[in-house]
Design a protein with these regions (language model features):
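Catalytic core and acceptor-binding pocket of nucleotide-sugar-dependent glycosyltransferases
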Residues: 137-238
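Conserved catalytic core of nucleotide-sugar-dependent glycosyltransferases
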Residues: 98-163
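Short, polar loop motifs at secondary-structure junctions
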Residues: 41-48, 98-103, 206
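N-terminal anchoring/stem segment of glycosyltransferases
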Residues: 1-67, 77-85, 134, 219-239
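Conserved hydrophobic/aromatic beta-strand scaffold that supports enzyme active sites
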Residues: 74, 114, 129-131, 175, ...
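Short, charged, surface-exposed secondary-structure boundary motifs
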Residues: 63-69, 122-129, 210-213
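A structural signal for well-ordered alpha-helical segments within the folded catalytic domains
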Residues: 20-23, 69-73, 152-160
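GT-A fold catalytic core of metal-dependent nucleotide-sugar glycosyltransferases
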Residues: 54, 67-124
Length: 239
């Protein structure tokens, strides 16, 4: 399995938040046992941290109408260049943090080419955490075509495709348990629905969200991050 992070910016640099989160991500993934060769960070500029270097692609992978769609553009480019191999890739946002190990032995895509969660009680797809294989190339292209046609984001585009079961796309997509992209929406119902231990949480490190996840200031009065990850956040000034 490969862990994939994508950041394309016309300014050819990380914004202030992501400049911190890229270090959090790398330290976190290494502490979870990921090998450096299995951590793939794709940008349109050079960057190195902990001896992990970014794979640099062109600015054409930036999506003007919805910047989050840049990850779909970039995956298509990686596929066309033969840089996606015959294994599972876990794409997640920089503000999505793995909490516990996920291995190819414990995680199965089955016959699916593409897997992700929804928002729990909200049925819309959540593309902040996606598992995919190279056989999903046409799905990625359908998403891109739909976003470009309607100038919409990738989550809306995917929902449009699955609602009409375009080209029988639904048979190739696996809906994952909310544990793989746990957010603070609908906390109580989603927490009890989540397979434990929760594998991945998703939040921007603003003070209110740090309080929510790191200090347990939520309806469950529960700290939702392991001490290991809290130490990494603290190391990089997120407290």
């Amino acid at each position: 399995m490969k862990n994939l992070l994508i950041y394309i910016n016309p300014l050819k640099n990380f914004d202030s938040e992501t400049a911190v989160l890229v270090k959090v991500q790398i330290d976190n993934l290494l502490s979870l046992g990921w090998k450096p060769k299995d951590i793939m960070i794709v940008t349109n500029f050079d960057y190195t941290y902990q001896d992990i270097k970014t794979l640099v692609l062109g600015d054409e992978n930036y999506c003007q109408h919805h910047p989050t769609v840049s990850k779909i553009y970039t995956i298509i480019t990686l596929l066309k260049k033969g840089l996606i191999k015959s294994e599972i890739y876990w794409l997640h946002d920089f503000d999505g943090y793995q909490l516990h190990p996920v291995t190819k032995k414990s995680f199965k895509l089955g016959n699916a080419d593409f897997a992700l969660t929804d928002y729990g009680r909200m049925p819309n797809w959540s593309t902040g955490s996606i598992f995919f294989k190279k056989s999903s190339k046409d799905i990625m292209e359908w998403i891109k075509q739909t976003t470009d046609k309607y100038h919409t984001d990738e989550e809306t585009a995917l929902s449009m495709l699955t609602r009409q079961n375009f080209q029988e796309i639904n048979s190739r997509i696996k809906k994952l348990n909310i544990s793989y992209n746990f957010q603070r929406f609908n906390l109580v119902s989603n927490y009890f629905a989540a397979t434990k231990p929760i594998k991945n949480v998703h939040f921007h490190p603003s003070p209110d969200k740090v309080d929510f996840f790191m200090y347990g200031k939520n309806k469950l009065n529960k700290i939702l991050l392991p001490k290991r990850l809290i130490r990494i956040f603290n190391k990089h000034g997120i407290k």
